Amino acid sequence: MPNFLPINTILVPQGAEYKAVCRAFRGVTGSIPTVVAIPVGMKPLLKYLHASPANAQFLAPKSRVLIMGICGSLSDRYKIGDLVLYQDCVYQGKQQECDRTFTAQLHSSVSQKVSLVKALTSDHLIWSAAEKRRLGETLAADVVDMEGFTALEFFNAAGVDVAILRVVSDDCQHNIPDLTPAINDGSLNPLPLAIGMLRQPLAATRLIRGSLTALKVLEQVTNLLFSG
């Protein structure tokens, strides 16, 4: 692990994203950060952060938290599999910035192509390509997620250095399935998820392919950062 950017904790949305990051550490020797699975969505994440038994570790002096995962593109510039590093995150007119020094160090550590972006955090799943393009244009945002702003607001208030590194899993040219009914209290419920996928098979196929591509890149970049 590069000693000049000691990362204490990696937070990753639970499920496939968390598993991809954990796979990246197989065979990695030396000091590795604690990888923590977090709930999906703003409200479940905020509740988790305030109640988590790992709070003492998150908020320790000089601790650094890296948030990883996948995201959706709001711009034609960012394609499936692209690696993005957040500069800041917006939500309903409010803005939270990532730590500039930490972000710059990560940027120089990732030898493969990585783009510095402005992110939007949404309190609901944005499945429509038209809505993605509209949000990208009106808010001048590049990508969208469902956790970034909440995490930044929490850790910035506590004085913890935070950076966010994500991989694009869906573009702004095609709809993805509306899986809103499947998201419940921070997790994906299998039955509504399956029903949502079956109702929109073409969109589901695109989402699965995009997610698999993004998860592979997520695993690769995690291994790259921490394998020395």
Language model segments and positions:
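Conserved active-site and cofactor/substrate-binding residues in soluble primary-metabolism enzymes
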Residues: 16, 40, 44, 97, ...
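Flexible, active-site-adjacent loop/turn segments at secondary-structure boundaries
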Residues: 72, 81, 87, 123-124, ...
